[in-house]
Regions:
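Short internal beta-strands
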Residues: 143-145
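Peripheral docking tails and interdomain loops at the edges
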Residues: 147-176
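Conserved mid-sequence domains
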Residues: 34-141
């Protein structure tokens, strides 16, 4: 467990930052970035599927990415971290409409809902998304992190909380 965690934090995430810079500066093709990202994604999924822990925590967390968001690596890593710490996990994946998210939240009744927003499409309206989530998911705390939350200057709507760093997210979700 700790080996995967260290590998992602010390090697993979810094490597992905460099890949992002190469992509932004036109030094690699988007297909190359997709290839690397999908190889890492596969490894994270295998790690999630094979994680074994003697710790059992009687709390559940639901992971999702909103419509227009397809960058799963941060969310998959958080899924891995919390599953390895004994939390029950429900992973919906990428591109989930808010109405579908609300349906699953009502069906599964998780203790917390979490999403990490990396790079949504240009059509994504963050404020509209926040309001929809706040209106449709009541009684279950929603935690959001990622670049969009760091640049948002207003107070999030009721029921939604922003976390600014990976460490903040881990500490908060592990203590819920």
């Amino acid at each position: 467990t700790k080996g995967m965690e260290r590998t992602v934090l010390q090697i993979i995430f810094p490597f992905l930052e460099k890949i992002g810079i190469l992509w932004l500066t036109g030094h690699i093709n988007p297909a190359q970035e997709h290839l690397v990202t999908n190889l890492i994604r596969q490894k994270l999924i295998v790690a999630i599927d094979t994680v074994h822990t003697s710790i059992k925590v009687d709390r559940s967390i639901l992971f999702f990415l909103p419509e227009g968001e397809h960058h799963e690596l941060g969310l998959l890593f958080m899924h891995y971290l919390l599953k390895s710490r004994g939390l029950q996990t429900i992973y919906l994946g990428a591109n989930v409409p808010v109405k579908d998210l609300a349906y699953i939240v009502n069906l599964k009744n998780p203790d917390i809902v979490y999403s990490h927003l990396t790079a949504t499409t240009s059509a994504f309206q963050f404020e509209k998304f926040l309001n929809q989530v706040s209106q449709q998911i009541t009684g279950t705390p929603v935690i959001l992190s990622g670049l969009l939350t760091q640049h948002y200057k207003k107070t999030p709507p009721t029921g939604i909380e922003f976390k600014k760093s990976l460490q903040e997210v881990i500490e908060h979700l592990a203590s819920v």
